[in-house]
Amino acid sequence: MEYGRVVNLEFKSKEDLVTFRNKWTKWWPNNVPEVVSRKSIRTSETSILLMATYETEEIADKAKEVVEKFFEMEAEHLHDVFAFHGEVLSDGAGAVME
């Protein structure tokens, strides 16, 4: 079952967001377990929403550990972090939950 992680990152400034994002896009491909999909949404001048889908909850948990280390390394740029996770549900037409 696919498992998703969504992380809202709020930065101290626009410059902090840009600095963090540029470091992140260079860092994650070589350090985070393989993802099914990954997207980012800039929700304001000083915040972004990171969304990743993994093949399993176990892979997502491994990714969480690695990503949190990156967040710690870049903490000087961060104001706040909110993280959510759970199984990925289909939103296709007529999708039924069992």
Language model feature labels by segment:
Residues 1-69, 76-98:
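Short S/T/G/P-rich N-terminal loop/turn motif that feeds into the first structured element of a domain
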